[in-house]
Amino acid sequence: MSITAERKQELITEYATKAGDTGSPEVQVAVLSERISNLTNHFKSHKKDNHSRRGLLKMVSQRRRLLDYLKEVNHSRYQVLIEKLGLRR
């Protein structure tokens, strides 16, 4: 259900805007998207896991807020990110 430290580090290096960048919206959205994807796969076999479903909804909301912020601050970075992640918007 959770992502491994190696996978998280790969995402950080791929989406970082500079060296050592772990807090930019791009990195946070990429990590959240990976976690959301893993939880979505989890729900295919565990349909009644409502406790984890609440966590999924919180992650989706957090990602939405980060994307809204990025869209407001720098629309070009927002466009690049949703294209790279394959998010529909």
Curated annotation (Swiss-Prot):
Transmembrane segments: none
Keyword Transport annotated: no
InterPro entries named among the record's database cross-references: Ribosomal_uS15, Ribosomal_uS15_bac-type, uS15_NS1_RNA-bd_sf
Gene Ontology annotations for the cellular component aspect, listed alphabetically: cytosolic small ribosomal subunit
Subunit comment: Part of the 30S ribosomal subunit. Forms a bridge to the 50S subunit in the 70S ribosome, contacting the 23S rRNA.
PANTHER family linked: RIBOSOMAL PROTEIN S15, BACTERIAL AND ORGANELLAR (PTHR23321), SMALL RIBOSOMAL SUBUNIT PROTEIN US15M (PTHR23321:SF26)
Name of the protein this chain belongs to: Small ribosomal subunit protein uS15
UniProt organism field: Bartonella bacilliformis (strain ATCC 35685 / KC583 / Herrer 020/F12,63)
Organism taxonomic ancestry: Bacteria, Pseudomonadati, Pseudomonadota, Alphaproteobacteria, Hyphomicrobiales
